[in-house]
From Swiss-Prot:
Phylogenetic lineage: Bacteria, Pseudomonadati, Bacteroidota, Bacteroidia, Bacteroidales
Keywords: Cytoplasm, Glycosyltransferase, Purine salvage, Transferase
Keyword Metal-binding in record: no
Protein name: Adenine phosphoribosyltransferase
Species this chain originates from: Bacteroides fragilis (strain YCH46)
Keyword hit for Nucleus: no
Amino acid sequence: MIMSKEKLIKSIREIPDFPIPGILFYDVTTLFKDSERLQELSDIMYEMYKDKGITKVVGIESRGFIMGPILATRLGAGFIPIRKPGKLPAETMEESYDKEYGKDTVQIHKDALNENDVVLLHDDLLATGGTMKAACNLVKKLYPKKVYVNFIIELKELNGKQVFENDQDVDIQSVLSL
């Protein structure tokens, strides 16, 4: 059964005032709890990247750890986690970035990627783009051949793609736009 993108969008739970008042939170976990929705999402993303030569899928903590390994398996690629500081056991590299309420940092193992890798960076949602931009900068420090960026959802009104306007070598796509 092929499910439309509209049906996928309708199945996303909206939670007002989470995590703080005034924020409308889009809960993508509703896409994962039903096998048909999960399969459809997996199929759509596989079709987007099946001919790109992806060698590593890099998922951002924590919801990038759900679809990231599924995509890696479907694409015949390895999976690499990007995590918060202190969570990876071997030698790491890090990138710090500003958030609306402070600073944050992401890390990757120094030996996670090399110049022969074609990378698909994945996270669940593109809002302002800060986390993914930091992750992209971090991945680029390991000199992969090409970097693709993928989101399940892009919140268009927040213009998160703007932080990538100087990264014309980065291909950015989302499955669903809200």
